Amino acid sequence: FASLLRRPGIQLSGDITPSYSALSVGTLKDIKANFEQRQIGLRPVFLMRDPIERIISSQRMRLRKQNQLNQEVEVEALRQLSVERPESVTLRSDYAHTLIALNQVFDPSECFIDLYERLFSPTSWQRLCDVLNVPYEEPDWEQQVNVSRTDTSIPNEVLAALGTWQAPTLTAVRQSMGHLDLAELWPLAHRWCKDLS
């Protein structure tokens, strides 16, 4: 990765993966120290999506890549996920872990932390540009990438099981970002996740 940053003319670089959300405080400290040693500014960007919506979308994308996406298979896969609760999925929606780790390693001014559902607005976009120290450029607000809309009706019992699984996530975000209207921004989580606070 460091070799990519040494290329002539490189002024800004980004790297994104949901797996970064599971990094430990120690690993984040090491990453930060390595960047500081190279005199490279580091700005974490952490976007949280409605956790139930995120699981549904992720599952849909996986099934689409396997050419298995249909309503029956999608519902059954979500039902199975809500029972098995695989660690790989749980880690990626453990927003509490990520928020705590970021707060222990970085100054709040160095991070952009927000909800995915708020990103596509001029106010949030401006805040992101400010944190990254890049000039504001108006994006094409109409362009959508990797949209995974569906007309699949997910049974209430599956949504309730997903809600039970993801309740700690909603509680953590409420505690951290209580000023936000999560009922409006995360309607699925708000409806199906029991409040644990």
Language model features by range: what are they?
Residues 3-7, 33-37, 104, 164, ...:
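Secondary-structure boundary motif
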Residues 9-10, 77-84, 150-157:
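Short glycine/proline-rich turn/loop motifs
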